[in-house]
């Protein structure tokens, strides 16, 4: 059994209030997420999870979609409250009736409690059924005036751990001849810089080697570009983080991904990691050229 304290977040609340956004936000924070787990299975599920050393943060979405099981949620929560190795927090999401009706109309969905009737009747019934659960929730968020980005930001502020910056910058060098990385958010082309490939002694080396690095960096256009690129990133990264992104992939490419892109990725990485959690990788550096 895992020796450390385990964290459980139960996401519940009104249909249309943002539970999916909340679950996705917690998933980005490293929580193992399960949607629509019947409450009666909660104690058994937790018995399985506590045996895993890799899962110490769990988020479960529980709502009235499984209405026939929902009556068992109170005793299930009582049982968890009596378990000393679990810290349970209930997150309840709600919104005003007018806002919920508007959201249902926008998505053209039926309310789960009134699939063939009035959306407002379904909302009223759901609000009444969830009143006791709302009363025992540690955190209640009204999303009426929140955009999804704002809800993600609120979730991040509430649940991010103090020892981890939830915004990670991934810097990657690559070669255009092998294709642009499909997961890149930002792509920068540095093929305009002088190419060490055409210098015989540097051809078998990479941008990690001192001779190549110094060669790439000695050109005025290199340093001018790097100054502008670092300034651009330092300006834009806080706004990407504000939008709720927890990861940003920045790809820097040259022809083969061996020299220029590697050197510049190392330089930019050292600048960015002074303020942000940063990982550096070189996708194509070890590739062998086909003869």
Swiss-Prot record:
Keywords: ATP-binding, GTP-binding, Nucleotide-binding. It holds the Pfam family RapZ-like_N. ATP binds at residues 13-20. GO terms for molecular function: ATP binding; GTP binding. GTP binds at residues 63-66. Displays ATPase and GTPase activities. Belongs to the RapZ-like family. NCBIfam families: PRK05416.1. This is Nucleotide-binding protein lin2617.
